[in-house]
């Protein structure tokens, strides 16, 4: 499918959405294909005025949407889920074209995105309240759950569809309306999903979206007293700014922020399984994943075996345009991402790391970087302290369980962690000691619509997905009834 064929599709939108109408602006910004540098769209560059219009539309639509029964909202959500699945092939190609990840991964993300809509279509019917034992005769105490109101969802470029639905699924299920600010690198994926939402029966004004002038959009959202909740996925530094600004109007916040995930391979681990898990986790989306491993800790007795197997497997990974057959590692999102990877690799090598695979820009040039394995890494290197967000596996040695737990926890972040062992006692001991919101044990994937997703320490606030995800969009109201 050519870029022109994508552009001719009914789901290809380039404006901003307010009250069910896609509008254009004279001022636009370019959306680029990270694999080729081609301009694939010129998108309306929205700012303060457009954001205020979007907030007003969401505010006006809120009473009617919250008044719908849970069963009615559930039916609309389920139809949205069906439409996403029906359009999986086209949506996957759109995502690969604007984001870069291999087509198989992109189609997998479409299914993953749809799973949140399906899940919360069911959870919409379970926003239950409570009957509390009264304190005196002739009285009752009831606790009800009600939608919080207008929600602002600020989504990232690395999972432009799944992070959108992980927020909008529970928001709509709860009875909230919203304003969506997708990342400027990947707005087209969000626009396509919102077009399908309208087709599914989401009323005009319930979902609105603006992209463009990030500072103006953010400032308008944070200043509005009508916006009662912020849900953000992105960097810790930006998240902290949003939390500070949210305090001015006491908005509720959900923050899914940065990580520095450890991946511990104990000497009793199944080494082949650990290598397979490392490849699947570290090089998915070219390492541009918030729960991607940043530090591989391998016990001294199995270090050489693990890193040699890992390096051999990494050398066999095919790099290229995600639309090409067999490609498993696509480009990084933009030149600044390449520069950060280069900075981390060069710093590590200068401080004594050994390049076991890759370690330099790919011959394809542009935003491509060779999948890399670095051995003999140690604390003090930039890649040990900062999230690389690229296809670099940094390998560290350790000797004892107590030592590696201390080193794994020696970070302000606590989003995800992983370890491999066949010792059941160690499974419980280490999982309790690791300071992280999610832990994969002999498992490289920790995100599903069924399980709570979120971090501790400076990696976030709140949880997404699961039965807890709906709670983030509800307020509890207590009713004290007398004279019965």
What name fits each language-model region?
Residues 34, 48-51, 70, 88, ...:
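Residues at or immediately preceding the N-termini of alpha-helices
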Residues 38-127:
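Glycine-rich loop-to-alpha-helix module at the N-terminal edge of alpha/beta enzyme cores
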């Amino acid at each position: 499918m050519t870029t022109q064929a994508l552009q001719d599709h009914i789901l290809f939108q380039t404006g901003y959405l307010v009250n069910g109408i896609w509008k254009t602006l004279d001022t636009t910004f370019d959306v680029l294909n990270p694999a080729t540098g081609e301009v694939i769209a010129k998108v309306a560059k929205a700012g303060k005025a457009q954001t205020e219009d979007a907030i007003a539309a969401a505010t006006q639509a809120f009473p009617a949407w919250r008044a719908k029964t849970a069963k009615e909202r559930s039916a609309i959500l389920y139809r949205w889920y069906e439409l996403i699945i029906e359009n999986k092939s086209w949506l996957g190609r759109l995502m690969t074209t604007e984001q870069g990840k291999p087509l198989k991964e992109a189609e997998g993300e479409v299914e993953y995105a749809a799973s949140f809509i399906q899940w919360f279509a069911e959870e919409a019917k379970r926003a239950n309240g409570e009957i509390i034992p009264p304190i005196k005769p002739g009285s009752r105490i009831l606790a009800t759950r009600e939608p919080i109101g207008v929600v602002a969802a600020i989504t990232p470029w690395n999972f432009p569809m799944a992070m959108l639905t992980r927020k909008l699924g529970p928001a709509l299920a709860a009875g909230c309306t919203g304003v969506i600010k997708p990342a400027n690198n990947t707005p087209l994926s969000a626009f396509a999903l919102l077009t399908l939402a309208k087709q599914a029966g989401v009323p005009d004004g319930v979902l609105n979206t603006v992209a463009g002038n990030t500072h103006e959009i953010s400032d308008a959202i944070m200043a509005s007293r009508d916006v009662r909740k912020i849900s953000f996925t992105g960097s810790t530094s930006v998240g902290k700014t949003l939390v500070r600004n949210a305090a001015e109007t006491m908005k509720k916040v959900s923050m899914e922020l940065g990580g520095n995930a450890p991946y511990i391979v104990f000497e009793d681990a199944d080494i082949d399984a650990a290598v397979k898990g490392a490849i699947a986790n570290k090089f998915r989306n070219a390492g541009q994943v918030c729960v991607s491993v940043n530090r591989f800790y391998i016990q001294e007795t199995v270090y050489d075996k693990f890193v040699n197997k890992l390096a051999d497997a990494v050398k066999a990974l095919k790099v290229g345009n995600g639309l090409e057959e067999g490609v498993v590692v696509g480009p990084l999102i933009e030149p600044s991402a390449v520069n950060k990877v280069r900075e981390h690799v060069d710093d590590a090598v200068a401080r004594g790391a050994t390049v076991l695979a890759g370690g330099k820009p790919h011959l394809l040039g542009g935003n491509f970087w060779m999948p890399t394995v670095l051995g003999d890494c140690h604390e003090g290197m930039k890649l040990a302290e900062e999230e690389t967000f690229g296809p670099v596996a940094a390998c560290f040695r350790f000797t004892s369980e107590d030592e590696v737990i201390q080193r794994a926890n020696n970070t302000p972040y606590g989003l995800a962690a992983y370890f491999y062992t066949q010792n059941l006692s160690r499974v419980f001991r280490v999982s309790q000691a690791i300071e992280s919101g999610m832990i994969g044990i002999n498992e490289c994937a920790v995100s599903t619509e069924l399980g709570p997703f979120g971090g501790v320490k400076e990696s976030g606030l709140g949880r997404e997905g699961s039965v807890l995800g709906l709670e983030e969009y509800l307020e509890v109201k207590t009713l004290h009834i007398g004279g019965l």
